[in-house]
Amino acid sequence: MDKIRIIGGGSLNGTIPISGAKNAALPLMIAALLSEEKLVLENVPRLADVALLQRILGNHGVDITVNGKRNGDDPHAGQTMEIDARVIVDTTAPYDLVSRMRASFWVVGPLLARMGEARVSLPGGCAIGTRPVDFHLDALRALGADIDIDAGYVVARAPHGLTGARIVFPKVSVGATHTAIMAAALAKGDTVIENAAREPEIVDLADCLIKMGARIEGAGTSTIEISGVPRLRGARHSVLPDRIETGTYAMATAMTGGDVTLAGARADLLESALDVLRKAGAQIDVNNEGIRVRRNGAGIFPVEVSTAPHPGFPTDLQAQLMALMTRAQGRSRITETIFENRFMHVQELARLGANIHLEGDTAIVEGSDRLKGAPVMATDLRASVSLVIAGLAAEGETMIQRVYHLDRGFERLEEKLSRCGAQIERISG
């Protein structure tokens, strides 16, 4: 099993190209199931989760062609993917594939809307909280689907098609909002989704579907209105830049006291996180090239942050911020409001010398001017990259095990960091 070895203590300086967003690419790939024509996606990141979804879509009979080669540090050099879902040969998404990634459950909406049926295994993925699929299923029921749970599979049927309806989510859910939008796009009549997620990835999905002929208004607000259409056509769409990768490298730069330009990044996608970084002492400059992050000489200031649905501070940057705050000049408080059990990185950060204690859903971080390298183990995607950030600032060697988590969400991480001066390498084993 691969490991990552880091010799910490240096600063990051240079340019890091920001990849296409995984959290946008996955629903966009799934949206191809809604059309008999080709969907061409540009700037698709090369990630384990993307490759797994290619296998899942292939299981349904979807033909996927990947073109384009990486072109140096061009921030728009992600792969181009042609997805042809003209022929659906199977509406079952099996356990052995879906159990490995929760987002793959989202195929249920498009398959049901287009084919009138779907049989999808209950999902797997990161071990952070329960993430129930109830909101997805309630939305599909509201649109007229019959839903049964049989031997670990969701069996959804709508032999006469779906019908527009009012969907009210009791709690904001990004995944369920994706499902509702895709299913409603082909439903008969009008659908109103209330308490919808407002994340940029929701907007990106809606923008792509509109290019395909969908009639959607309000994406990016809490109320989305959709007028169903009989069919969707093919389209070409570029995946938006990854705001979580952007925030991660911005925090790594602040942690090490460097000067890095995040090429291709969009500040409007993560304003809350950038505001927190400014409060922590980082200098943030936005220009035509992307976002420049600096912290030269000044200390790191403690902050108090609660995660929240967009436009609040993203839960997917909580672990990275905690790593940064281990070096702050004082006490920080970080409250997790989105997922339960998302503090599994605390114990591993403590192995590097971090002083963190938990009070319910809040982590109290006592900053220190010293971390020391040690062997640590990644527990999930975001926790693993928080250990990378801490390792970059720690004295001596940090060895991170179970780095397959990183490959799910960060493209060429070691290469991008090493080009900015980090002493980081992958050790195969």
Swiss-Prot record:
Q: What is its main location?
A: cytoplasm
What pathway does this protein act in?
Answer: Cell wall biogenesis; peptidoglycan biosynthesis
Question: Where does this protein hold phosphoenolpyruvate?
Answer: K22, N23
Name positions with the PTM 2-(S-cysteinyl)pyruvic acid O-phosphothioketal.
C126
Q: Which residues form a coiled coil?
A: none
Enzyme category, top tier: transferase
Sample GO molecular function, one term: UDP-N-acetylglucosamine 1-carboxyvinyltransferase activity
EC assignment: 2.5.1.7
Say what the protein does: Cell wall formation. Adds enolpyruvyl to UDP-N-acetylglucosamine.
Name listed for the protein in its UniProt record: UDP-N-acetylglucosamine 1-carboxyvinyltransferase
